[in-house]
C-alpha cells in the first residue's frame, strides 16, 4: 500500500516498481477491504469534515448502531481515529486530496458512499489544484459515484456546491442552511422545513459553524433511521475532537487552546466561536503557523489579516518553506500583530510574557507547531513562580 505522500524517487517505491511487485493506494485498499458492502456515510468539504464526522459517529453510536469510522482526528470518548464497528454503517471523513502518485483523483472517489454530506467548498490545496473549478470537478466525480437511492446532503449557501450539482446529480438531494430543508437559527433551534426538531443550545461545541456541522450530521443520521430529536439530544454529550478548540491547560489564570485551523475561513470561524465563549471583554491571543501547503505558497495571504482581526493580539510564526512576508500581510492589523521566525520556545516565552490572567491563548496550525501549547503553559508556570 502506497500513501499519497510517497512520490517517485523514494527508494522503497523505486524497488517495488523495479521488481514489478503489486501495489495499491490506501483509499483503494480501504474501499476493497473495509467499505465494500457497507452503508458508507461520507463527510466532504473544505472545512468541518473532522468535526462533522465525529458528530455523526457520536449520534449513530448513541442510537446503538455501532458504526465503524475513519476520521482525520480523534473524537473524545473513542481514543482512536478509526474503528471497524459492528454494523453495516461506516462513517468516513472524505478528503479531496489526491490518492497516490499513480492516481491523481481525489481520495473520496474510492469510498462509494450511500449518504454523502457536502459541507462547504472553497479553494484550498493550492499545491495540487490550479483553481476552485478543479476542486469542483473532483466533487462532481464524487457525486457521480452515489447511487440513485443514495442521498446527497448539500449546503444550500455554497455557490461552489451549486455548480457541482449542476454538473449532474442522479441521487436524492436534501439541503441544509435552507428554509425549505434543514436549518438552524441564531438561537440554535433546528427545523426541518417549518417543523421544529429540537435545540442545539446545550451542545458543548461552540460557534455557529459547529451548529451547522451538527445540522448536517443530524440530516445524515436521519437518512439511516435516527429520529432528529434523538440525534439532537445525543449531541448534548458530544465531547468534541482533539485539536478542535481543545483546552490544553490553564496556568496563572491563562487558558491555552489548541486548534487545527489553517485556512483563513477556518481561522475566522474558530476565533468567532471562541469569542462567543469568552465574551467581548476577555483578550484572545492568537498564535498562528502558516504551515499547510496552501498557506506556505502564500495563496491565501491577502485574507489572513481579516481572518485574525477579532483577536486582541496576533503572533504569526514564519517557519521553513514560507517564502512570503507575513509581516506585510498583517500590516492591516497594526501594532497588535507580530511576526516571529526564531525558535519555537522563544515564541512561547514571548506569548507567555504577554498573557495576563483572564486571557485565552489560541494556537492554530495543521501541524504539531513544535509543541507550542505545552511550552507556553510551562513558561506561564515559570513566570508565575518568579512573581
Task: Show where each model-derived region lies.
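Structural motif
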Residues: 1, 42, 91-93, 117, ...
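Phosphate-binding loop of NTP-binding sites
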Residues: 4-154, 160-171, 215
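A conserved, hydrophobic alpha-helical segment in the catalytic core
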Residues: 7, 109-123, 199-240
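Beta-strand->loop->alpha-helix junctions that form or flank phosphate-binding loops
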Residues: 24-31, 69-73, 168-187, 202-208, ...
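Generic structural signal for helix capping and beta-alpha/helix-loop junctions
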Residues: 33, 77-78, 183, 238, ...
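Glycine/charged-rich beta-loop-alpha catalytic/anionic-binding loops adjacent to active sites
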Residues: 37-41, 193-203, 249-254
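A polyampholytic, Gly/Pro-enriched intrinsically disordered region
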Residues: 43-51, 94, 189-201, 336-339, ...
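ATP-dependent carboxylate-amine ligase
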Residues: 140, 167-172, 216-387
Amino acid at each position: 500500500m502506497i500513501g499519497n505522500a510517497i512520490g517517485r524517487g523514494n527508494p522503497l517505491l523505486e524497488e517495488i516498481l523495479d521488481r514489478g511487485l503489486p501495489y495499491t493506494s490506501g483509499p483503494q485498499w480501504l474501499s476493497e477491504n473495509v467499505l465494500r458492502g457497507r452503508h458508507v456515510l461520507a463527510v466532504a468539504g473544505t472545512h468541518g469534515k473532522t468535526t462533522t464526522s465525529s458528530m455523526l459517529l457520536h449520534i449513530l453510536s448513541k442510537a446503538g448502531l455501532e458504526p465503524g469510522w475513519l476520521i482525520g482526528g480523534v473524537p473524545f470518548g473513542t481514543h482512536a481515529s478509526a474503528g471497524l464497528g459492528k454494523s453495516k454503517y461506516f462513517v468516513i471523513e472524505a478528503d479531496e486530496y489526491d490518492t497516490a502518485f499513480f492516481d491523481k483523483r481525489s481520495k473520496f472517489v474510492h469510498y462509494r458512499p450511500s449518504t454523502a454530506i457536502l459541507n462547504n467548498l472553497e479553494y484550498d490545496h493550492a499545491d495540487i489544484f490550479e483553481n476552485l473549478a478543479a476542486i469542483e470537478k473532483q466533487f462532481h466525480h464524487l457525486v457521480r459515484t452515489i447511487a440513485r437511492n443514495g442521498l446527497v446532503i448539500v449546503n444550500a449557501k455554497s455557490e461552489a456546491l451549486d455548480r457541482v450539482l449542476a454538473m449532474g446529480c442522479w441521487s436524492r438531494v436534501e439541503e441544509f442552511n435552507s428554509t425549505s430543508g434543514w436549518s438552524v437559527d441564531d438561537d440554535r433551534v433546528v427545523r426541518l422545513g417549518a417543523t421544529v426538531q429540537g435545540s442545539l443550545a446545550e451542545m458543548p461545541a461552540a460557534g455557529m459553524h459547529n451548529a451547522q456541522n451538527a445540522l448536517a450530521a443530524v440530516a445524515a443520521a436521519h437518512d439511516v433511521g435516527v429520529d432528529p430529536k434523538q440525534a439532537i439530544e445525543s449531541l448534548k454529550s458530544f465531547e468534541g475532537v482533539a485539536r478542535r478548540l481543545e483546552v490544553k491547560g490553564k496556568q496563572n489564570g491563562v487558558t491555552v487552546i489548541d486548534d487545527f485551523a489553517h485556512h483563513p475561513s477556518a481561522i475566522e470561524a474558530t476565533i468567532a466561536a471562541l469569542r462567543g465563549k469568552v465574551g467581548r471583554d476577555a483578550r484572545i491571543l492568537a498564535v498562528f503557523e502558516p504551515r499547510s501547503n496552501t498557506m506556505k505558497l502564500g495563496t491565501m495571504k491577502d485574507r489572513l489579516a481579516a481572518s485574525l482581526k477579532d483577536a486582541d493580539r496576533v503572533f504569526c510564526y514564519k517557519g521553513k518553506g514560507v517564502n512570503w512576508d507575513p509581516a506585510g500581510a498583517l500590516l492591516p492589523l497594526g501594532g497588535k500583530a507580530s511576526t516571529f521566525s526564531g525558535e519555537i520556545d522563544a515564541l512561547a516565552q514571548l506569548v507567555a510574557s504577554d498573557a495576563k490572567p483572564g486571557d485565552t491563548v489560541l494556537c492554530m496550525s495543521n501541524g504539531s507547531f513544535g509543541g507550542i501549547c505545552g511550552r507556553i503553559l510551562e513558561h506561564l508556570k515559570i513566570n508565575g513562580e518568579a512573581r
